[in-house]
Structure formats: structure tokens, C-alpha cells
Amino acid sequence: EFGVGSHRNGTLDHDDLVFGNHGFQSVERVLTPTVFAFLDRYRPETLRPGLYHADGQQDGEVFEAGSFRQSRMHAAGVRCSDCHDPHGGKLRRPGDATCTACHSPAGDARFPSAGGRSYEGTDHHFHASGKAGSRCVDCHMPSRNYMVVHPRRDHAIRIPRPDLSARTGAPDACTACHADRTPAWSAAVLEERRKASGTAAPGPH
């Protein structure tokens, strides 16, 4: 109860509460009225083989916190509650509207670098609207099943880099669907489309 009250009074980052339930870590200290901060209470697992792939993508069932904390979104100030209702955990908006609330021409004043253009057309996702591959999460938050029936989306929310997958052996979002192809094929297709559209080359991963 004091945890919720402390959050309500503005003395605690909401994500400190969330990460404790949605991460893979060991407990360092028991929760007390003076110990709320995530890193004061927990020791998160590091990005190591068996838990994460070489490029940081989830491998073992590491839940969401570790992936999200390494994301550009988290570094820019995005919090769990920007996308999810903090009480029920459900998305605040349906489908791609979760992403286009910021990644759109109108954008969100808190995250100016996310807006300024539309990402909803086939010129961005290269797939027929409404079909597999056209949703933001298909490419930027690929899902993996754990224990057969437990799908989890990778919350690192990364830009697909099949060129890196070809070198590191990490999963490639494209060939997760195009299973008869290789990451090298994906990289060549993306490079061809990038040049045709005049899009800047991807920066460091």
C-alpha cells in the first residue's frame, strides 16, 4: 500500500514499481518504506548468452524490463505508462495507434524526434495494409513463444538490422516470416528500398 501511495505522491518513478514485476533479476533488498528505487532493491540480469542474443534481443524468457531499459525509447524518457494503463496493463490505444500517437506528423511534444512524418503506409513497412508485416510490432517488437503458449514481444523496440543478424546470428525480424530467405537477403532488400526512398542509412546499433 505504501508503494502505491508513494507513487501517487510523486516520490517514485512508476517504472520502478513496474520493473520489479516485469523483469528478470534477483532481489538484493526487501521492500521497505525507504527502499523503492528499482536499482536499490534489485540486481538486474546482464545481457549475457542464454538470456540475450549478441545484439541485445531477447533469447531466454527475460520478460520486458531488461529489453525496455536498453531501448532508445526508454533513453528518450518514454515510460511504461505512456503505452500501458498502469493499473490493468492493457494498451492505452488499440493496435498501431499505440505507436502513431508519437510516430506521426502531429507527434507528441514530449518526444519531438519521433514525429514529423507518417509511418503507416506501404512505403514504410513494404506490406499490404492489414496483412502480416504491416503492423508496427511485426518488425519492431517481434514475438517469441515461451513454454509453448506464452508469447512475449521484445520491448527493446529496435529498428530491424538484418545486416547485423547476418554477422551475429541474432534473429532477423524479416526472416521470422520469410523463413525461406536469409538475413543477407533481407539486408539487400532493405538497402535497395532505402536508397530508392532516399532514407538515411541506419546509424550504430
Regions found by a protein language model. Name each.
Residues 1-205:
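Primarily the internal scaffold of c-type cytochrome electron-transfer domains
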